[in-house]
Structure formats: structure tokens, C-alpha cells
Amino acid sequence: MPGSDTALTVDRTYSYPGRHHRCKSRVERHDMNTLSLPLNIRRGGSDTNLNFDVPDGILDFHKVKLTADSLKQKILKVTEQIKIEQTSRDGNVAEYLKLVNNADKQQAGRIKQVFEKKNQKSAHSIAQLQKKLEQYHRKLREIEQNGASRSSKDISKDHLKDIHRSLKDAHVKSRTAPHCMESSKSGMPGVSLTPPVFVFNKSREFANLIRNKFGSADNIAHLKNSLEEFRPEASARAYGGSATIVNKPKYGSDDECSSGTSGSADSNGNQSFGAGGASTLDSQGKLAVILEELREIKDTQAQLAEDIEALKVQFKREYGFISQTLQEERYRYERLEDQLHDLTDLHQHETANLKQELASIEEKVAYQAYERSRDIQEALESCQTRISKLELHQQEQQALQTDTVNAKVLLGRCINVILAFMTVILVCVSTIAKFVSPMMKSRCHILGTFFAVTLLAIFCKNWDHILCAIERMIIPR
């Protein structure tokens, strides 16, 4: 049957996923992001024709959606540009810090001037991009608010247009039904003027609605006449390619219309509409179910696309934040590493300087001790020479004065005692010199020694007073 063939053709067209994907891509290239569903089906000749009639409200909705999508794309682009500018600014800051750490004062001043110019340029560009971003956000909010206010008005307009279109189709059906019967009886091949089933279903539904509202279905003719006066050229639209529609008297009521449709037949050799209505109704029901499923799939796909875009935006935002944080941590780590290297170098230099100073002090102390020991040795040698001279002199005196043995013996003993005393004195002097020599290294040591001796003298002089004071402090009254 032609009706079933039409339903199967539409079913195959919408059920084949590859073709549906290609059709969707073509529609997206022509700025139509949604699948427009057929609102009226007309048949003529040997081909099946689909009449795609898109309401103005849907087109306005698509325009608003396309404008909002373009604004969202611009917002994403501007956001990426802002992130790029911020990363370049951070890179300039890191490079400036590295160059300043390794540069002189003059070079640091020049580098600072260049960095300030770059920083001002990047700040200006970021400010401009932020202004653009705010403008795009404001436009997007305005478009969303305007689209929400228009949608309630467009819904009522679409309902009125659907009612007018269904009544007009019912009027055309009632005028072309007798002609369909004649063509089926004459058996003209290649021409099929059978209107779609859902036209009759729609006309009956609206007839029932109007009957419930106005009390009778006879007022449909008046509504049809008003619609014909509103758009008279739509009623004279032909269904076949070479067939001519002859205007016939209208049916007076819904019963006549139903009887006319039940008696009509196709020109392709099919039975009457009443006989093949079941298969056509099944095909049309399947088509409606498939179209409803396609709508649900389309809505689900749109929701998934929005969720994916939201996830992409969130992922990009989080990725930019994490990358910026990692970059800041890397720059901080590099700065800390440079500071650590500088501190280690400074400590190494300080330890080297301390080692050099300790070595020089040790050399000085060793040299001074050597000089002092040599001086003491020379003094002892001089004393020994003097003692030897005195002994020689004593021997000479003993040889000369043999008479005065006792006197010489006494004199020798005295001299020995004196020499021993002198030796003790020299040893004491050398020992005192060894203890005093560290106190006489510098002026500070000399002053400290002088003050210590002075305090000791004062302490010895006032020893009685000190003892009295101690007794007063210890013994209570």
C-alpha cells in the first residue's frame, strides 16, 4: 500500500543511523541544530513527498540558541586568551627574577624597565579581554532573558497555527475526497491522491473539540470559510504531479466526511481506505513512536552535549588552575633552590675565611712562642756565661789568695749562695715571663693585666676592711 510504503520509507530514513548522522551534520552546517519533523505529508505521482513546515517560533528559538552558542564559544575563547596572557605574565615574572638574581645594579635597572613595559602591556591586554568577557556574559544573560520571555508567547502562537493548519487540511480533504473516489473507479495508473491518515485523525479530533465547545460540528464550515478567506491559496494546493483537483461540494458534517473517506480508493490498484486503514494506522503509529523516540534521543543528546560542554569547561578551568598552581610551585621551588645555593656558597666562603684566619693566628702564636723561647734561651746562656766567668774569677782569686783560705771559702760560699739565688730568681723570672707573655700580646691584654694588678693591690691594702665587712655580713647582729 502507498501509505504503508510511505511509513516504511520514513521509518527506514529515520532508523538508519549513518544517514541520520549525515542529515544531522548537514542541518548543523546550515545552522539548524535540531531535526525538523514533518507536520504535513503530501503524495503525488510515483514518489513520496514530505512537507517540512517549520513554525516561526522554532526558527526564533534556533536563532536564539545559535546566538547563545556563538556567545559561549566566544566566552571560552576569551577565557583561554586570558589564561594564556596570565601564563605569559607569570613566565615574564619568573624570567625577571632569574635575571635580577644574576645581574648587576645597572643591568637590574634596565631589566626592570623592560619587565615593567611587558607587565603593563600584558595587564592592558588582560583588562581588555576581561571587558570583552563581561560584555559577552551580559549579552548572553540578555539573550536568555529575552528567549524565556518570548517562549510563552510563541507557544500560544504555535497552538493557533496548528489549529488553523489542521482545519485547513480537513477542508482540503473534504473537497478532494469525491475526486479520489472517481479516480479510484476510473483506475488511472501512477496517480495517488489519498491524503495521509493523520490528516483525517487531526480533522476528527479538532471536529470533536469544536463540537464540545460550540455544541455542534456544523460550525466547522464557517470556520473553514474564515480560514479560506485568511489564506485562500492554500486550499487549491494540488496533491499529484499531473493530476488536477476539481472542487467538489463540501461535506456538511463530520459523518459525511467520514463516509467520503471510507468510500475513497487509491489509484495504484489498492482497496478502499477502510480496508487498508489498519496497516496504514499501524505504520503511522510506528512512525509517531519512532519520531517520539527520535525527539527523546535528540533531547537526551542535547542534554549530554550540554553536560559534556560543562564538563569540558570545568575540566579546562581546573586544568588551568592546577597548571597555574604547579607553575607557581615550580617557580617557588626554583627560587628556594637558588636561595639555598646562595646560602651554601656563602657558608662555604665563611668557613674558608675562618680556616684561613685560624691558620694565620696559629702561625702568629707559634712564631711569638718561638721568639719568646729563643729570648729566654739567650738570657739563660748569658747567665751561664756570667756564672762561668764568675767561677773562673773565683778560681783566680783562690789561686791568688791562698793565704786567706777561710775568707775565700766564705767568699766562695757566699758567691755560690748568690749564684743559686740568682738562678732561682732567673727561673722565677722566666716562669713569670711565660705566664705574663700571653697577657702582653696586645694593648687590651696589657690594660687588663694592669687593672688586675691594681685591683689586687687595692684588695691587699684594704684586706682588714674587707674582712670586717665579710664578718658583718656573715655574723648577724
Curated annotation (Swiss-Prot):
Compositionally biased residues, Polar residues: 258-273
Record's keyword terms, sorted: Coiled coil, Endoplasmic reticulum, Membrane, Phosphoprotein, Transmembrane, Transmembrane helix
Stretch list, region Disordered: 168-188, 249-277
Top-level taxon in the UniProt lineage: Eukaryota
Pfam families: Tmemb_cc2
Topology versus the membrane: Multi-pass membrane protein
Keyword Acetylation recorded: no
Modified residue annotations for Phosphoserine: S46, S253
GO cellular component: endomembrane system; endoplasmic reticulum; endoplasmic reticulum membrane
Tissues with expression: Widely expressed, with highest levels in brain, spinal cord and testis.
Ranges in a coiled coil: 112-153, 282-398
Record GO terms (molecular function): 14-3-3 protein binding; identical protein binding
Transmembrane segments annotated in the record for this chain: 417-437, 450-470
UniProt xrefs under InterPro entries: TEX28/TMCC
Compartment(s): Endoplasmic reticulum membrane
Subunit text: May form homodimers and heterodimers with TMCC2 or TMCC3 via the coiled-coil domains. Interacts with ribosomal proteins RPL4 and RPS6.
Family: Belongs to the TEX28 family.
PANTHER family according to UniProt: CEREBRAL PROTEIN-11-RELATED, TRANSMEMBRANE AND COILED-COIL DOMAIN PROTEIN 3
Designated name of the protein: Transmembrane and coiled-coil domain protein 3
Organism of this sequence: Homo sapiens
